[in-house]
Amino acid sequence: MNTTKKLMTMLLVMLAITAGHAQDATERSISVEALGVHNIVGINFDSRFRGNHGIGFRVGVGYAQGKGKHIYFSPSGTKTQGVAFPIEINYLLGKKEQKLELGLGASLGYYGERMEFGIIGGHQYMPVTEKKFGYFVFGNIGYRLQTNSGLMIRIGWAPSINFDDGGCHYLQRRLLSSLYISVGWRL
């Protein structure tokens, strides 16, 4: 079984386990996140297994976009955009409104990569678009303010690493780092 299939199987099992526990959760929230694992913008559902602290999970959907350079094949660069689905297991430390958030997860995505060709060696090349599956794993270290009135604000850092993405150039960077900000509301 290749790495992609193993990762997909592991994520589906994690999602099934967390969905079963979600029925007992006492704290749930929905939020809009800029940057971070979504790259541009995304929507997240977050839930604790008990109370408003300890272990929980987050699932989301987001829009990703990026630009890159291909020195040999596309001197004009590449443009990548697509949809991503991050899944994270996280832990909240703290007793009141202010908490430290720690998490690990993976983001699965389907991306369209457009290579903008130009003139190379006197020959003109046309743009090429490829659709590709890509994924990366990420960590999460953040500050979470969750007020008694229901407002939730998250600010943090989500470093990510890609191991093998099947050639999706947007995701081929080995060490990605991204700050994020998120605003949400308790459900």
What residue ranges belong to the model's regions?
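Bacterial Sec-dependent N-terminal signal peptides
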Residues: 1-26, 183
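A periodicity- and composition-biased signal for non-globular, repetitive helical segments
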Residues: 11-12, 64, 150, 160
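Outer-membrane beta-barrel pore domains and translocons
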Residues: 20, 35-37, 60-64, 105-109, ...
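Residue-level preference for beta-strand/loop junctions
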Residues: 26, 37, 81, 133-135, ...
